[in-house]
Amino acid sequence: MNNYFNKLTFIQKIKHLGQCRLMKKNEFSDGVRALLSKKIVIIGCGSQGLNQGLNMRDSGLNITYALRRDSIINQSQSYIRAMKYGFSVGTYDELIPEADFVINLIPDKYHESLIQKIEPLMKYKAVLGYSHGFHIVEIGVKIRQDITVIMVAPKCPGTEVRQEYQRGFGVPALIAVHEENNAYGTGMELAKSWACSIGSNKAGVLESSFVAEVKSDLMGEQTVLCGMLQVGSIFCFDKMVEDGLDSGYAGKLVQNGWEVITEALKQGGITLMMDRLSNVSKLRAFELSDQLKNILTPVFEKHMEDILDGSFSKNMMLDWINKDCKLLSYRQNNSQLLFEKAPVYCETILEQTYFDHGVLMVAIIKASVELAFDIMVKSGIKPESAYYESLHELPLIANTIARKRLYEMNMVISDTAEYGNYLFSDFVLPLLKKEFVPYLKRGDLDLSHVNNIVHIDNILLRDINEMIRTHPIEKVGVQLRSYMKDMVSLSF
């Protein structure tokens, strides 16, 4: 595929993929000063557009929304949202020519046509912002040289961007300046100011590149973040129902279980998550995790290869041309899942029960997080970026499932993430049912094994604990989580 990334030399590709630096807190001492006097126009009022705009306004910035003329006339959902929260709204022709800083927060599929419309309207030396670099990297359209192009990519859905800000904190973000569009050398200061305005400076910011953000983001969302949560939800629910468990209980265990289990992941990595299990369950989860890795490694590697060479993007863009035929078909099929239709279970499930009854769910998380991290790092992506795109974002995506199951997750994430998620889960789910089910035991999704007398091999337990603690993702996780010590814990 002839895109920006594929036009780079091999050395340039390695450089861009490996661009990653954890920024120091004192680098953000100027706060939002660089943007205080700017007229900022956000295009798009979806999940990221609305919630970033709310944070930026609360940080003292001047925010308006530019929408298509027909969206205003017909009072689209974006128009209704912007008006509900008291923002000024105008057309592209009305707002873009006066804007100092234009932030493009519409879905990836519309970026190319949008830039064709707004670039002639943008004033000399204006700034163009993205929160995902797909248009720059995968399509590769050149932006006018006098325009500075920057990115702030929060590592979570838009709803969580707002919630963490309202808690007085923020979410980690990757920031970058497109090296072909930084003629005046102001891009980084503006990107830092933008990051401060949404609260990311409080949670950890990586200085990255458009390439590293796009390739790691696509890999994370397709595999561990959305793909495996979807596969795991369907697989675990179906298995419990097949084993005779009440469908309401099974639905609640899965729906809320990801959030409860990954809260431990957020606070203390895989080590803490595994420590919430009994010794018997920990040994079993470790064993199941290894089996999953053996089955899934070729699949994860294939997704990474397709992302790097552009095959994934090419096929998705063909679906755009075909009016999202595949995406809409996947979406319809997903709405008919038994898990999505499971009855509400009204009785309380205690926090520890989610761990005790969800050994398989813990194993799925461990396997997919470590596998995605390892493959990204092998591909040239730095451990810090790989951590944010695997372990860190997982609890934030799990929170969406806890609200309204897979429907909520797929509604909140981008169309790009949703398409990749379906592509992954459509292949992996039958694979696991064929190759992984034979390894399962009754106790992997209930407590039946706990009452059995099991001899614990102390040496084996010691060695497994050591392997868990010394995995590279645990080492980088300790450093990155230190920036998030003010993060509020969820209670269940």
From Swiss-Prot:
PANTHER family: KETOL-ACID REDUCTOISOMERASE, MITOCHONDRIAL (PTHR21371:SF1). Belongs to the ketol-acid reductoisomerase family. Keywords: Amino-acid biosynthesis, Branched-chain amino acid biosynthesis, Magnesium, Metal-binding, NADP, Oxidoreductase, Repeat. Mg(2+) 1 binds at D217, E221. It catalyses: (2R)-2,3-dihydroxy-3-methylbutanoate + NADP(+) = (2S)-2-acetolactate + NADPH + H(+); (2R,3R)-2,3-dihydroxy-3-methylpentanoate + NADP(+) = (S)-2-ethyl-2-hydroxy-3-oxobutanoate + NADPH + H(+). Substrate binds at S414. Residues 209-344, 345-487 form the KARI C-terminal knotted domain. The keyword Transcription regulation does not apply. GO terms for molecular function: ketol-acid reductoisomerase activity; magnesium ion binding. It comes from the Bacteria. NCBIfam families: ilvC, PRK05225.1. Mg(2+) 2 binds at D217, E389, E393. It is an enzyme of class 1 (oxidoreductase). Its EC number is 1.1.1.86. GO terms for biological process: isoleucine biosynthetic process; L-valine biosynthetic process. The lineage of its organism: Bacteria, Pseudomonadati, Pseudomonadota, Gammaproteobacteria, Enterobacterales. Signal peptide: none annotated. Gene3D superfamilies: N-(1-d-carboxylethyl)-l-norvaline Dehydrogenase, domain 2, NAD(P)-binding Rossmann-like Domain. The gene is ilvC. This is Ketol-acid reductoisomerase (NADP(+)). It comes from Blochmanniella floridana. The keyword Magnesium applies. Pathway: Amino-acid biosynthesis; L-isoleucine biosynthesis; L-isoleucine from 2-oxobutanoate: step 2/4; Amino-acid biosynthesis; L-valine biosynthesis; L-valine from pyruvate: step 2/4. SUPFAM superfamilies: 6-phosphogluconate dehydrogenase C-terminal domain-like (SSF48179), NAD(P)-binding Rossmann-fold domains (SSF51735). Binds 2 magnesium ions per subunit.
